[in-house]
């Protein structure tokens, strides 16, 4: 197949969607398919196309939210290039700029469209509402309407990564069409101990000031309100109060609230047991998993939580807050533990760090618990959905054009012009 992935996030930008899209590209190519990526670049004026990697980047302007950039929803300069690919299917990975572009192209040039819903937008509305109760309620209703519109009216098939997102659409949004649950896979071999430079891991532990008997909990993610970082700091404050000085917490990642949490950590006098490392290259992530003993997260806004799968691939037991997003990955007392509040979290953190027998038992069962997240399984599950999308597209009757006819009239006259990438 010739497949087009449209996304607003792609490396070098680091987040869950970016990782998922890059992983999907790699997995599909490993199965013999040709995969193109259309994404937003880091420059405000430059178009670029990597002929070897099949990655097309359009200009983008900073939004002022993390490192996100906004692009034109119909960048004319790249239309001819994309048409030359003769795509069999378009797979949208976003509801925003490149997602709208994907929908317009799919409709205008009669290409089947698959959409994956990656982000629990209802958990992020406070960025707009600033936690104003009634405004936030309105924002959540708008998110519900737009989410249903994108997934119901504009896509031939619809993918979600977890049962949590499935229930959001079925139970809260009352979405009645077929939903395909396809968890993102990972290249677990990257995290195998034999493929990691353990000498470098030892050097990193030493540089961070960790002693041989220190039990290090690792969190990897964005330093922002939705990741519930304050919860982790409160847990560490209680652990310090209990004089468990060998328990440490390392937080890897950047974000809008990093300085706020760093200040809070100092106010709570946790500098001896908590470290904020900042962002780290994706290629170095296996090193961080292996310098820790276990993974810890209190985030309740995940659609899937790829970092949890990565931790399990590195044979690290996972302690996570009770949330449906983690239920398909973590089994209590098998490869990790669940907690509901700070006191339970503290209790389990201490238990795992002191009960060597239980720790080794959980560790032993980590890798076997993520076999279903292999790259091959991921690619073939998505390919099955593509086949359904193509069948649905070929069998359906014409449907309302919404804004597509208007766009077609505006831009069809430009098709024969030469648009060259700079």
For each feature predicted by the language model, list its residue ranges.
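Short hydrophobic beta-strand element within catalytic cores of glycosyltransferases
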Residues: 317-320
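Aromatic "clamp/platform" in nucleotide-sugar-dependent glycosyltransferases that forms part
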Residues: 300
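Carbohydrate-associated surface elements
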Residues: 41, 164, 185
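A conserved mid-protein helix/loop that constitutes part of the nucleotide-sugar donor-binding site
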Residues: 19, 215-238, 249, 256-262
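Conserved acidic donor-binding segment of nucleotide-sugar-dependent glycosyltransferases
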Residues: 332-343, 351-356
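Short alpha-helical donor nucleotide-sugar binding micro-motif in glycosyltransferases
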Residues: 279-280, 287-292
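Nucleotide-activated donor-binding/catalytic signature segment of Leloir-type glycosyltransferases, i.e.
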Residues: 260-280
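N-terminal subdomain of nucleotide-sugar transferases
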Residues: 1-45, 49-57, 403-422
């Amino acid at each position: 197949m010739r497949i087009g992935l449209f996304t607003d996030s792609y490396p070098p930008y680091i987040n869950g969607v970016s990782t998922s899209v890059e992983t999907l590209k790699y997995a599909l190519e490993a199965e013999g398919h040709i995969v193109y990526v259309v994404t937003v670049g880091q420059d405000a004026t430059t178009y670029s196309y990597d002929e070897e990697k099949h990655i097309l980047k359009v200009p983008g302007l900073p939004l002022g939210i993390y490192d996100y950039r906004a692009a034109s929803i119909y960048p004319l300069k790249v239309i001819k290039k994309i048409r030359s690919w003769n795509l069999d299917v378009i797979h949208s990975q976003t509801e925003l700029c490149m997602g709208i572009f994907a929908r317009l192209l799919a409709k205008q040039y009669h290409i089947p469209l698959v959409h994956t819903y990656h982000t629990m937008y209802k958990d992020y509305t406070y960025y707009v509402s600033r936690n104003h109760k009634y405004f936030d309620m309105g924002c959540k209703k708008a998110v519900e309407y737009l989410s249903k519109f994108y997934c119901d009216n504009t896509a031939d098939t619809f993918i979600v990564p977890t049962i949590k997102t499935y229930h959001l659409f079925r139970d809260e949004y009352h979405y009645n069409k077929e939903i395909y649950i396809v968890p993102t896979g990972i290249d677990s071999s990257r995290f195998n101990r034999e493929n990691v430079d353990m000498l470098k891991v030892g050097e990193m532990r030493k540089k961070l000031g960790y002693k041989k008997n220190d039990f290090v909990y690792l969190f990897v993610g964005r330093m922002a309100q939705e990741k519930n970082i304050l919860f982790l700091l409160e847990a560490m404050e209680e652990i310090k109060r209990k004089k468990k000085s060998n328990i440490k917490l390392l937080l890897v990642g950047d974000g809008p609230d990093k300085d706020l949490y760093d200040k809070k950590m100092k106010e709570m006098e946790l500098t001896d047991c908590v470290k904020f490392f900042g962002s780290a290259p994706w290629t170095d992530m296996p090193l961080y998993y292996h310098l820790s003993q276990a993974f810890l997260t209190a985030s309740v806004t995940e659609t899937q939580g790829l970092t949890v799968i990565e931790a399990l691939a590195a044979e690290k037991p996972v302690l996570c807050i009770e949330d449906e997003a983690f239920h398909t990955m973590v089994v209590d007392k098998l490869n990790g533990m669940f907690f509901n509040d700070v006191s339970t979290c503290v209790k389990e953190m201490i238990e795992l760090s002191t009960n060597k027998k239980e720790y080794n038992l959980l560790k032993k069962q980590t890798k076997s618990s993520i076999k279903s997240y292999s790259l091959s399984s991921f690619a073939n599950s998505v390919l099955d959905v593509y086949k359904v999308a193509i069948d649905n597209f070929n069998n359906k009757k014409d449907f309302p054009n919404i804004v597509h006819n208007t766009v077609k009239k505006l831009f069809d006259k430009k098709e024969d012009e030469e648009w060259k990438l700079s």
